[in-house]
Amino acid sequence: MPITSNEISVEVNGQVYTLPAGSTLGDALKVSRAPYIAGAAIGILKKAAEKRTEKITEYAINTPKGELRIEIKDPESTSGKLWAEHYKEYEGKDIHWESPEALAFGPFEADIKPSRETGNFEAFDVLFGAGGFDPHNTHLILSRKRHSAEYGSPDDGVFASIVTGRKIISKISKEDSILSIEPVIEWERITEKTCTTDLSTPLEDEDSVYTYFEVELSRNAPVGAEHFYALTREGTLKVDAVTSSFISDDSLREVPAPYENFEQRREGAISVRTVGYGTGRIYISREERPSSLVHSVVGQVTKGLELIKLAEKGQKLSVESLPPQIVLLGHSFEEVEPLLSSIGVELIKEGYAGENSVIVRQEPPTTLEILGEAKVKAYAVARTKLIEVELYTEIAPKSIDFFRHALDLKTKTVGKLPVHMIYETTYLFKTEKEMVKYKEILPENTPEKKVLAGEIGITNQAAKRMGTIGVRLIDDDLFGPTGEKFSSTNIIGRIVEPDRLKGIKEGDAIYITEVARKENGGQKN
């Protein structure tokens, strides 16, 4: 249907919609029903921006061995113009010859005047060369190392250099070919683009809108994939840092992740830093980067890469992951069994199997391992054994960070907490992890007059038993939940139903899950 003056054509996540002129971003969301989490940023790219006549100087050449990128030295040179006009014709060209010094894709016909002069070439130079000085037998030549040769090149000689993927040219062999060649858009130079949370933003004809990005997680990195699932549990990724080459989310910084997958970081590659400063941070590459021994690749953006390139620091982005995470913890056998059966996964039940069961442990622990093995062993307890807690995140953030790290609540919905000691109405717990070795606990939200029954306390570093977690079933105006004086006690939250602790013994373990905090909770007493 032709577009009238009262209509505009807008593309939303690759699908074209016709909207009334004057429509807003919110209107486009309603019509398209596009995936979107409220408050997330949405990218808008003007069609005019995509058609800019600005000279493109960088191209991505995809081969079976990986992607390499070349940068044109002078787009106005004879070879530069030849490349810009005909690069698509070089797709599908095989390796015609290779040597320790260079390799050549072709042949093809080109409008060049071959020179019979000997040329001097550096590693990673790119040039045209005519075999037998015949323009009908032209090749695209990539230099592997410094050397001299007569390639029948035009007078301007080297017209480009390889800027990324340099290791690939040593791996390319005669069985390989050019799969595709694409220009690389210099996003930073495009001014007609925006990334906004304002749904009243007006749209224009031929605008492209990106509401979310899609991720395919790597089966070579099951634990790293689980790290990403935990990071995006609410359906969004937070943009804590932005550079020309990546964006990152620091939400799980300092949460250890193993190195699992050594792989080239292509555009859209998702990696987790496994060693050193920023351990646990998730990166999404905006441009190709070499493989790294400290960045394990856990997935790849398969849709919405434009949103990654448009994102700004401080925003959050909607994300969907494939495959979807399998979440068993906190659910009953009755809830998860139909889902697992529908995807061909066998459920092996252990522990409490009566009514109101709740799963607190599973093996294997990750979604991708469960799918790979097509079975999962789940251990359940009675729901009355699952302790729900409200945490005072606004007034005790650092202490709560310690608590979540210690119980793995940063990456799981249920955490385990061993019972250390019980006396009268006081319950003391020690975490399984030796968190105190690398987490200081400064005084924070210390009580002033009274601690209420069911409030959770952590001994801070003002006392010897730093890191001890405690709860009392009665109010106390002298000592905190761990038996320490108020100045040595940080109050981090409360147990919703403290009576669920009754009946547990020393040496037992309780299972903890977070629930949303009610208004006005956690005020100093």
Swiss-Prot record:
By its UniProt entry, which InterPro entries does this protein fall under?
Methan_mark_3 (IPR016466)
Say which family it is in.
Belongs to the UPF0288 family.
Which HAMAP family has this protein been placed in?
Answer: UPF0288
* Name under which the protein is recorded: UPF0288 protein MM_0912
Q: Which organism is it from?
A: Methanosarcina mazei (strain ATCC BAA-159 / DSM 3647 / Goe1 / Go1 / JCM 11833 / OCM 88)
Q: What lineage does the source organism belong to?
A: Archaea, Methanobacteriati, Methanobacteriota, Stenosarchaea group, Methanomicrobia
